[in-house]
């Protein structure tokens, strides 16, 4: 039996880190939402009991370093599943981009295996298991839009922002999330107003959403990688209503209500970014 699942990317509309935790992670306070750029996974049951990963991408590992593999291993051990699974992964989300591609693959694996192995777990139960795999996995299990706290695993559902176009641009660099958080100085970094973003989303106020975009990690990534700042400036000059780096970067996104403006951004960015996407916010369900 084979199950096909989609793994959509996420963006952070606002991201603040509030304190460093004893476990080395940071406490975060953020609003995340899903977009319709997605990886595709095919999960096929194996009688042998092994987990076999088949990622069609040079920079994506096929072993326990892959979060989808790790998710399958955690679920298999937790419920003492005898059968195995082959995970065929077709990547569309850029790698090491701040878009939670790996976390979303893990979440999609959990959702798919719940069906394949007939576990009948709720999304909440899958999200709890996902927190063992990675901080962004619980959000990716639930999808939609949410306020995240703790390491990112504590979620409060939020109405999704009004529909708009999202232009994603990833420069040809990779950024290590651990390195960015490690270099973060909470004393000097400019901190975003998370409450203002939550209010803007609840009020469905697109202008206020664009004005409230903020990411404390820009204070680290932008000085390290000037090309990220250049992309932000270019997007603003092309008339994007809101511009922000997603996660630890290096991907930058622009929000606009106008399709022709999104297309203009895409055409301009293709000149100096080989990974550019025009997508939509996914809304409540995926």
Curated annotation (Swiss-Prot):
<dbReference type="InterPro" id="IPR013750">
    <property type="entry name" value="GHMP_kinase_C_dom"/>
</dbReference>
<dbReference type="GO" id="GO:0016114">
    <property type="term" value="P:terpenoid biosynthetic process"/>
</dbReference>
<comment type="pathway">
    <text>Isoprenoid biosynthesis; isopentenyl diphosphate biosynthesis via DXP pathway; isopentenyl diphosphate from 1-deoxy-D-xylulose 5-phosphate: step 3/6.</text>
</comment>
<dbReference type="GO" id="GO:0005524">
    <property type="term" value="F:ATP binding"/>
</dbReference>
<keyword id="KW-0414">Isoprene biosynthesis</keyword>
<dbReference type="InterPro" id="IPR004424">
    <property type="entry name" value="IspE"/>
</dbReference>
<comment type="similarity">
    <text>Belongs to the GHMP kinase family. IspE subfamily.</text>
</comment>
<protein>
    <recommendedName>
        <fullName>4-diphosphocytidyl-2-C-methyl-D-erythritol kinase</fullName>
        <ecNumber>2.7.1.148</ecNumber>
    </recommendedName>
</protein>
<dbReference type="InterPro" id="IPR006204">
    <property type="entry name" value="GHMP_kinase_N_dom"/>
</dbReference>
<dbReference type="Pfam" id="PF08544">
    <property type="entry name" value="GHMP_kinases_C"/>
</dbReference>
<keyword id="KW-0067">ATP-binding</keyword>
<comment type="function">
    <text>Catalyzes the phosphorylation of the position 2 hydroxy group of 4-diphosphocytidyl-2C-methyl-D-erythritol.</text>
</comment>
<dbReference type="GO" id="GO:0019288">
    <property type="term" value="P:isopentenyl diphosphate biosynthetic process, methylerythritol 4-phosphate pathway"/>
</dbReference>
<dbReference type="InterPro" id="IPR020568">
    <property type="entry name" value="Ribosomal_Su5_D2-typ_SF"/>
</dbReference>
<keyword id="KW-0547">Nucleotide-binding</keyword>
<dbReference type="InterPro" id="IPR014721">
    <property type="entry name" value="Ribsml_uS5_D2-typ_fold_subgr"/>
</dbReference>
<feature type="active site">
    <location>
        <position position="136"/>
    </location>
</feature>
<dbReference type="InterPro" id="IPR036554">
    <property type="entry name" value="GHMP_kinase_C_sf"/>
</dbReference>
<dbReference type="GO" id="GO:0050515">
    <property type="term" value="F:4-(cytidine 5'-diphospho)-2-C-methyl-D-erythritol kinase activity"/>
</dbReference>
<feature type="binding site">
    <location>
        <begin position="94"/>
        <end position="104"/>
    </location>
    <ligand>
        <name>ATP</name>
    </ligand>
</feature>
<keyword id="KW-0418">Kinase</keyword>
<dbReference type="Pfam" id="PF00288">
    <property type="entry name" value="GHMP_kinases_N"/>
</dbReference>
<feature type="active site">
    <location>
        <position position="10"/>
    </location>
</feature>
<keyword id="KW-0808">Transferase</keyword>
């Amino acid at each position: 039996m084979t199950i096909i699942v989609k793994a959509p990317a996420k963006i952070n509309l606002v991201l603040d880190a509030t304190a460093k935790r004893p476990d080395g992670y940071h406490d975060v306070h953020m609003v995340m939402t899903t977009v319709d750029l997605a990886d595709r996974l095919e999960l096929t049951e194996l009688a042998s009991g092994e987990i076999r990963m088949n990622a069609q991408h040079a920079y994506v590992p096929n072993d326990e370093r892959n979060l989808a593999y790790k998710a399958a291993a955690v679920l298999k051990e937790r419920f003492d599943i005898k059968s195995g699974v082959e995970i065929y992964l077709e990547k569309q989300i850029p790698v090491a981009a701040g878009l939670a591609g790996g976390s979303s693959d893990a979440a999609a694996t959990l959702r798919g295996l719940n069906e394949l192995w007939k576990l009948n777990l709720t999304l909440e139960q899958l999200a709890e298991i996902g927190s063992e795999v990675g901080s962004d996995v619980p959000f990716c299990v639930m999808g939609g839009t949410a306020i995240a706290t703790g390491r990112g695993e504590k979620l409060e559902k939020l109405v999704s922002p009004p529909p708009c176009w999202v232009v994603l641009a990833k420069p040809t660099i990779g950024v290590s999330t651990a390195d960015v958080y490690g270099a973060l100085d909470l004393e000097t970094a400019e901190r975003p107003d998370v409450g203002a973003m939550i209010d803007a989303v609840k009020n469905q106020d697109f202008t206020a959403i664009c004005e409230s975009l903020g990411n404390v990690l820009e204070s680290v990534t932008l000085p390290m990688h000037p090309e990220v700042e250049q992309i932000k400036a270019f997007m603003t000059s092309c008339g994007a209503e809101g511009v922000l780096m997603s996660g630890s970067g290096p991907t930058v996104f622009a929000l606009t209500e106008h399709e022709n403006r999104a297309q203009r951004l895409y055409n301009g960015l293709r000149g100096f970014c080989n990974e550019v996407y025009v997508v939509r916010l996914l809304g409540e369900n995926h």
